[in-house]
């Protein structure tokens, strides 16, 4: 899905922030 692609790009750019990003996506 689009959200999965966004998360992958975020992981590539800022791997440290992925944990918070996933929590935010999961909350939504």
UniProtKB/Swiss-Prot annotation:
Primary location: mitochondrion
Protein's UniProt name: Cytochrome c oxidase subunit 5B, mitochondrial
UniProt topology in membrane: Peripheral membrane protein
Keyword terms, alphabetized: Membrane, Mitochondrion, Mitochondrion inner membrane
Similarity comment: Belongs to the cytochrome c oxidase subunit 5B family.
GO cellular component: mitochondrial inner membrane
Pathway: Energy metabolism; oxidative phosphorylation
Task performed by this protein: Component of the cytochrome c oxidase, the last enzyme in the mitochondrial electron transport chain which drives oxidative phosphorylation. The respiratory chain contains 3 multisubunit complexes succinate dehydrogenase (complex II, CII), ubiquinol-cytochrome c oxidoreductase (cytochrome b-c1 complex, complex III, CIII) and cytochrome c oxidase (complex IV, CIV), that cooperate to transfer electrons derived from NADH and succinate to molecular oxygen, creating an electrochemical gradient over the inner membrane that drives transmembrane transport and the ATP synthase.
UniProt subcellular location: Mitochondrion inner membrane
Subunit structure: Component of the cytochrome c oxidase (complex IV, CIV), a multisubunit enzyme composed of a catalytic core of 3 subunits and several supernumerary subunits. The complex exists as a monomer or a dimer and forms supercomplexes (SCs) in the inner mitochondrial membrane with ubiquinol-cytochrome c oxidoreductase (cytochrome b-c1 complex, complex III, CIII).
Keyword Methyltransferase attached: no
One of the GO BP terms on file: oxidative phosphorylation
Keyword Hydrolase among record annotations: no
């Amino acid at each position: 899905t689009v959200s999965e692609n966004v998360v992958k790009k975020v992981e590539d750019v800022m791997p440290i922030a992925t944990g918070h990003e996933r929590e935010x996506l999961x909350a939504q």
